[in-house]
Amino acid sequence: MRLIQSEIENFPYQRLKKAAHMTAVEAASHMGAGCSGAAFNVLSGNDEPLDEFEPLVARLRQTRAFYDLMARHLGRAQPIGLYTAWNKDQAAAGDFINHPGWAMGHLGQGSQILEAGLPAAYQAQGSAVTLLFPQSVAAMSPEEIRKALAGGVYTDVETLNLLNQLGYQELTGMTAEQPHPVDCIEEFTAHPLNGPFARRQRDCRQSFYRVSGYVGYVLKKSDPKVETLARLVDYSGKELSSCSMATYENKLGGRICVSGYYPWDHLHSLSKSAQMKSVMRWLARDRLPAYVASYHKVNLWVREPKSGRIAIALLNASFDAADGLDLAVATSAGEARVFDMQAKEQVIRASNTDGPYRRFVLPAVEPWTMRLVVVGACEASF
């Protein structure tokens, strides 16, 4: 499909309710996520002068060149990265258990992972990692479940239990026992995926945030190849769980990481965001096309057009400027073209190499502003 339009609707069309800048950013983010353009439903329907909307229309006109660049370089290639395993059959799965709200309850739970600078994907085909939820499993065929478990999966205990109940324990490698609903603190082990953050702690304050399914669990290894990334201790330092987060490589060659303590929340500390990026690289076997290696709050959409070019749309999702934003790109190219929202171009060189990734430190990105980064010598086409 060549044209996938999104609608930017500023209902109830009162100018002070939404900034012109954010309206322009919203359209660009939709294009980054896969749309080929945007239709703007932003003007008043009343029989009155439209003078108050002139600044809004002017901003959209100023941003048109950036939209054109995005359409040209992103083309119709699909975003590659972390797939949240949503499908349209989940609503029916919720109805089947007489709990219709359950089917969509996970939507948005993966947002904190994606906000740390990991690329989003919206289809299983071509995705590098699957973020798996019980709602997803309930609406997947056995073949789809096995295919996911033969790739890279990050998940929680609720999903682990469901997978095991369905007979996939040989592929998950572990079980969950002894839930601890209070006074747990996550402590990182000296595992290589934790890098320099061994013994760092993450306290999610269970007494404040009583989130269903987020109690601290003891993960039991059903295969000795399971490796421990974190344990749980209480406020006195006493161990409550010798294993609360673990990784496993199964007989299909798939890799799985299970977190038994706030797997989708409270992920934005330096140590935890760094750990999650290392975990996602491991799960993907370094097939992530790009990610933000520095400590910034950034949303990322990455495409690989057929020409071999990598095109990246990124959003600084913070009210602070992103200085020193370090973008890791799976490429052998030594230069990247960076376009701001005024369509001004800068060419930057890779600062260093990290395995299959070249690292590019971008010029400062203003708060809640986007960039288009293009790496590779071939012209994109669509």
Features from the language model and the residues they span:
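Short, well-ordered beta-strand segments enriched in hydrophobic/aromatic residues
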Residues: 309-317
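Hydrophobic targeting/anchoring helices
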Residues: 1-108, 185-217, 229-233, 237-250, ...
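C-terminal beta-strand-rich structural cap/linker in extracellular carbohydrate-active enzymes
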Residues: 152-155, 353-382
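Beta-strand-rich binding/interaction modules
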Residues: 321-347, 372
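Solvent-exposed beta-strand/loop surfaces of large extracellular or lumenal domains
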Residues: 236, 337-358
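Short, hydrophobic/aromatic-rich segments at coil-to-beta transitions
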Residues: 223-231, 309
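A glycine-rich, often tryptophan-bearing local segment used as a flexible ligand/cofactor-contacting loop or short
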Residues: 136-208
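Short acidic low-complexity segments
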Residues: 118-128
